[in-house]
Amino acid sequence: MAREFKIEDYRNFGIMAHIDAGKTTTTERILYYTGKSHKIGEVHDGAATMDWMEQEQERGITITSAATTTFWKGRDEKLRRFNIIDTPGHVDFTIEVERSLRVLDGAIALLDANAGVEPQTETVWRQADKYHVPRMIFCNKMDKIGADFYRSVEMVKSRLGATAVVMQLPIGAESDFKGVIDLVEMKALIWRDETLGAAWDVVEIPAEFKEKAEEYREKLIEAAVEMDEGAMERYLEGEMPSIEEIRALVRKGTIEVKFFPMFCGSAFKNKGVQPLLDAVVDFLPSPIDIPAIKGVDAKTEEPIERHAEDSEPLSMLAFKIMNDPFVGSLTFCRIYSGVLKKGVSLENTVKGKRERIGRMLQMHANSREDIEEAYAGDIVALAGLKETTTGDTLCDPLKPVILERMEFPEPVIQIAIEPKTKGDQEKMGLALNRLAAEDPSFRVKTDEESGQTIIAGMGELHLDIIVDRMKREFKVEANIGAPQVAYRETITKTAEIDYTHKKQTGGSGQFARVKIVFEPNPDGEDFLFESKIVGGSVPKEYVPGVQKGIESVLSSGPIAGFPMLGVKATLVDGAYHDVDSSVLAFEIAARAAFREGAQKAGAQLLEPIMKVEVVTPEEYVGSVIGDLNSRRGQIQGQEARGVAVVVNAMVPLANMFKYVDNLRSMSQGRAQYTMQFDHYEPVPSAVAQEIQKKFA
């Protein structure tokens, strides 16, 4: 079966937005007008086709990115293939957004015409900047009370530091929003309300908008001709570029991320969606318009590029794993080069394992079709892969490549979790492992000391949703504990302990004497053991017993029972008995010596210190710094990033719980932060006493 669409007719794009900017409604309308879904689903009644997880229907926020294939005839009547990736808009799911941005070629950024650039818009915009994604802007909800297109244009500049090139002007606003003025063709499009927005009339620009339209068209042309010296010279000599030339130049500027074409409409009222689809064809890149993906040769580690061509060796990136109730586990992959055929065996170069390709599916929001082949530029869902997780590369085993890995932040919050009924323990383990395979920012481990299952993630909402999904998808109900900090203990001074263990009551007894020096390990956090026995006061075969005895109590320190770090122990002398001594006797003696020694060597409590980075608009810098100081934080410095300020600090993890809520309210939700573990540091004595009371 040959390729149906040329690769230049593909558009792989996503829709990125703040929570309530109308992303799902816009996607729905796109699916409706491109003829894939017949009844328009409304988020208000929770039936949108893209929002297919139950929870999303309840919360009205989109959590998992689903990939949908649909088709659109451009203004030249030629059919194009759209692969639309739905992205979440909630701050705890920015990992999902990063993941989708990684495999997109372009994006539509939605704004709410009433709110303009909102906090999450800033976050997602910065992530798209990181991956250099070409974008268009759609100012949605023009029918809403308080809608103001011109203010939104201004906010794109002031808050995002980005250049918007206005392509359309609204005709009316709020309940009077009738249509748009196309600044390229200088015509007005007025939608017919009675046709659900499927039909519109092209008319002359109303007299009262004529002057404004002329002014904005001039700005549009000035931005366009900047893209080409020849066009610029002709323009300066008084020659106007043609309509085709304007579109070609705007396309060039968009793909090179020099500026962002801006449109307006109301997806809910079905106005402005079709011109937006034409703009996707006109201005967003196809897979061959963007730089080839870079990777390294899996054998030689030499850098290589893979071009978006069917003739190149097959390479693809797994960017999403989801559980489908009918098919089981589905791995969504973006094919960057080559052709994928059902039944072939591929190399997972990150894991060093082989995978056989069984079922291949083309996904619509919640229906699916089986396919036999897929090509460069396609996004496919593969059923039944065993080893592959998010961010892995799958490729031709004869030409192995590792495409650039995605980076996922370390989880920052952990809680203990247990099933409500003992019998569900195994089921819970399976559920958590399955969820961890889907989501690299979520981790599961067992606490060695308490035997409890600990789950860790990106934030409190993130873990709430995990617990919720466990209940819905795996029918396991769980109780969760309070968020916990992983403290440690160490020693600060040198102490010499001489300890004799003696138990002689008829028959064979037990005898061992040890003299051990305990001191801080100068080389770091590990445990170091040395024996300086000369002249056989402790026979060689008993020395390992001394080391084992000390190691067995390192997991529980003297202050509050936390694991100990950075201890050095040196066995300097001892004594034994021909009959009563044994390895076990020396183990017991060493254990007791360490318990005594840890107390005398100035035991100290340590806490994890996190490296915190807060990105905030300038007006909140003072509040952010004051708040971090109040959390025992040490400010390391600040720098400008675009129109925002980055504040770096070291803060104890214990003082960072609920930080996200505080930061949101402090900055009206416009600042965001990341944090990761940096090092351990002694706990101030007042705080240490409280911890000791709590855990001792």
UniProtKB/Swiss-Prot annotation:
Any Pfam family the entry gives: EFG_C
Entry protein name: Elongation factor G
Top-level taxon: Bacteria
PANTHER family: RIBOSOME-RELEASING FACTOR 2, MITOCHONDRIAL, TRANSLATION ELONGATION FACTOR G-RELATED
InterPro entries found in the cross-reference section: EFG_II (IPR041095), EFG_III (IPR009022), EFG_III/V (IPR035647), EFG_IV (IPR047872), EFG_V (IPR035649), EFG_V-like (IPR000640), EFTu-like_2 (IPR004161), G_TR_CS (IPR031157)
Domain tr-type G: 8-288
NCBIfam families membership: EF-G, PRK12740.1-5, small_GTP
Species, as recorded: Chelativorans sp. (strain BNC1)
Gene Ontology BP term (one): ribosome disassembly
Homology family: Belongs to the TRAFAC class translation factor GTPase superfamily. Classic translation factor GTPase family. EF-G/EF-2 subfamily.
Function of the protein: Catalyzes the GTP-dependent ribosomal translocation step during translation elongation. During this step, the ribosome changes from the pre-translocational (PRE) to the post-translocational (POST) state as the newly formed A-site-bound peptidyl-tRNA and P-site-bound deacylated tRNA move to the P and E sites, respectively. Catalyzes the coordinated movement of the two tRNA molecules, the mRNA and conformational changes in the ribosome.
GO molecular-function term, one example from the UniProt record: translation elongation factor activity
Keywords from the UniProt entry: Cytoplasm, Elongation factor, GTP-binding, Nucleotide-binding, Protein biosynthesis
Gene Ontology cellular component list: cytoplasm
Residues that coordinate or bind GTP: 17-24, 86-90, 140-143
Disulfide bonds: none
Record's subcellular location: Cytoplasm
Major localization class: cytoplasm
